[in-house]
Design a protein with these regions (language model features):
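Short gly/pro/ser/thr-enriched loop/turn and capping motifs at secondary-structure boundaries
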Residues: 53-54, 136-141, 145, 162-166, ...
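Short acidic, glycine/serine/threonine-rich loops at helix termini
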Residues: 59-60, 141-144, 167-172, 185, ...
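N-terminal glycine-/serine-/threonine-rich beta1-alpha1-beta2 phosphate-ribose binding loop
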Residues: 1-121
Length: 434
């Protein structure tokens, strides 16, 4: 992504900006719109949300004049609006991937169920896809990335989110030939694994966010999802179920997230994890056996070794996303994508005693929380992927703290997400048995 500022200026001067279709105009989408308005060589001519009013509010926040907005209900109407210099606002997400002038689709919905449909339609329509929907990525990302490559388009995680920010450091370290010992993110407070939206309602109002979304962060689900995404993009593994989540400072990260034989918490090198105390930063701990390079790292104040730290003290979430969209078009590259075969799994852990006949709710709600384990362990125990849990009906009681298994379910709903996950599992050597 070198000189992307210059490339965007070139596109602006030629009148050929990168064109983005934005699906989801909530908190994330609002920031994307606002940021895009400041940028050269990039436009968002189509915005979708569940209501026209939400889409209009997002555009208003981005200082788009009301007379530059048009409500549309068809591809043809959207094309006409865009041709007249207006932003097409829609409530039907399927309009956006079908628009001929759109080069990149950004999924800012946060729904795995909707995300897979958006991805499939975008790939089929030959659009690059920016997957902000990390919950969808950890469920079916590998097969979506495979399908995108076969279609000649880019499937990518979003710059600004922790996974892509971590991968930026990981790519730097591995390109230089260093061995990655650990990669992770910071958390500001220890997890509250029993958190519910009700208990967090007041805090959510203060932060102007939904209680469900806040709960997903507080109960650890979001951290598990993000680090599972990193694992499946790198081959690094969770060292233990749920990760260690050790306390650390910026100065001690490389001393904590290293093998126990070196005084750290890891059973083995090559781990994904999270640290309490270094939010909002992300990090990579690396090492090298090369004596001259070790000496050079000491001279550059990287510490005495054997492990060294790369630290990015920020991740700007949605604010950075337009750069990923531009990168797909200008360079044909991703900000991060899954490997062909996943290595880790996000699993669902009961938050409270669950009863036979109950229908499981959404991530960040009341029934379960997300955790992480190796894919091998999840398959051995026949564990249900976190992204498939919503809407499942239980066939038996489940004690608090126990992972939910495929065989705990009355049945799996027949949804596009479930079908796509089955296809992904069939591409692996030992698929789980539903």
């Amino acid at each position: 992504m070198n000189a992307i500022n210059e490339r965007l200026l070139e596109l602006e001067s030629k009148g050929t900006p990168v064109t983005i279709g934005l699906i989801g105009a909530g908190q994330m989408g609002q920031e994307i719109l606002c940021q895009a308005q400041l940028m050269k060589g990039l436009r968002i001519p189509a915005v979708v949300d569940v209501t026209f009013e939400r889409a209009e509010l997002a555009c208003q926040m981005a200082n788009v004049p009301a007379d530059k907005l048009a409500r549309v209900n068809s591809v043809e109407a959207a094309q006409a609006a865009i041709a007249s210099g207006r932003i097409a606002l829609a409530t039907d997400w399927q309009i956006v991937p079908k628009l001929p002038g759109i080069q990149v689709v950004v999924d800012a919905t946060g729904s795995p169920e909707l995300g897979v449909s958006i991805a499939l339609e975008s790939i089929q329509s030959k659009k690059h896809l920016v997957m902000m929907n990390v919950e969808c990525d950890v469920t079916v990302g590998p097969i979506l990335n495979r399908m995108a490559r076969e279609a000649g388009v880019i499937y990518t995680l979003a710059a600004g989110d922790e996974p892509a920010a971590i991968l930026e450091l990981y790519r730097f370290a591995t390109a230089l030939g260093f061995e990655v010992v650990a990669a992770g993110k910071g958390k500001n407070n220890p997890l509250d694994i029993a958190a519910t939206p009700d208990a967090l309602a007041a805090r959510a109002r203060e932060r102007d966010m939904s209680a469900r979304m806040l709960c997903e962060f507080v109960d650890g689900s979001k951290t598990a999802v993000e680090m599972c995404s990193v694992a499946n993009a790198t081959g690094l593994l969770p060292d233990v179920r749920g990760m260690h989540g050790a306390k650390a400072t910026r100065e001690t990260l490389h001393q904590v997230f290293c093998p126990k034989t070196q005084g750290g918490v890891l059973n083995r090198p090559g781990a994904v994890d999270f640290a309490i105390g270094v939010h909002p930063g992300v990090f990579v701990v690396f090492t090298t056996d090369q004596p001259r390079l070790r000496h050079g790292l000491i001279q550059r104040d990287m510490g005495k070794g054997p492990n060294y730290l790369l630290f990015r003290p920020y991740h700007l979430c949605s604010i950075e996303v337009p750069l990923t969209a531009a990168q797909t078009v200008i360079y044909g590259e991703s900000s991060g994508h899954p490997l062909p075969s996943p290595v880790a799994e996000c699993i669902a852990i009961a938050k409270r005693p669950l009863k036979a006949g109950e229908t499981l709710d959404a991530i960040g709600e009341y029934c379960y929380r997300g955790s992480i384990d190796t894919l091998a362990a999840a398959r051995q125990e026949n564990l249900l992927p976190l992204g498939l849990a919503r809407g499942c009906v239980l066939a038996r009681d489940i004690a608090v703290g126990r992972p939910i298994r495929y065989d705990d379910l009355d049945h799996l709903p027949d949804t596009p997400l479930v079908r796509m996950r089955h296809r992904q599992d069939q591409l692996s050597s030992k698929p789980p048995s539903p």
